[in-house]
Amino acid sequence: MSDGTLVFPTQFIDSTRVPNAGIMYSKDRGKTWKMHNMARTNTTEAQVVETEPGVLMLNMRDNRGGSRAVAITKDLGKTWTEHPSSRKALQEPVCMASLIHVEAKDNVLDKDILLFSNPNTTRGRNHITIKASLDGGLTWLPEHQLMLDEGEGLGI
């Protein structure tokens, strides 16, 4: 994070054998780690980015199928709120995806950008696509998408 906090996505199985995504973090350069609450039940294979100082977005494989779940925390996972795009904006066939945040100072548009890649379909692992969001993940417009491969694949 911009304040030096180390953060990475996690998943754990609860007592009913349902997977849950969340985050772990360290404020002491990795000497100790803490974890608070899950972001959403029945989710795995998450990606985490800091969208603005102190605000983390967790983008998760949702085992219910059809689309990605997305949640926001401003307190390192103590509380989570569902992002407006959750289960709406990013279709997928229930598989791993990638998400990165590119700061305005590091790109030619001079805007913060989220880059996301996954199979852009609800069936099969094909149509591997990179998408860009210029509004914090609210929209992923077709003109900001690049299909890399139409064929079947095992991963991204």
Can you describe what each PLM-predicted range is?
Residues 1-156:
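Asp-box/BNR beta-propeller blade signature and adjacent active/binding-site loops
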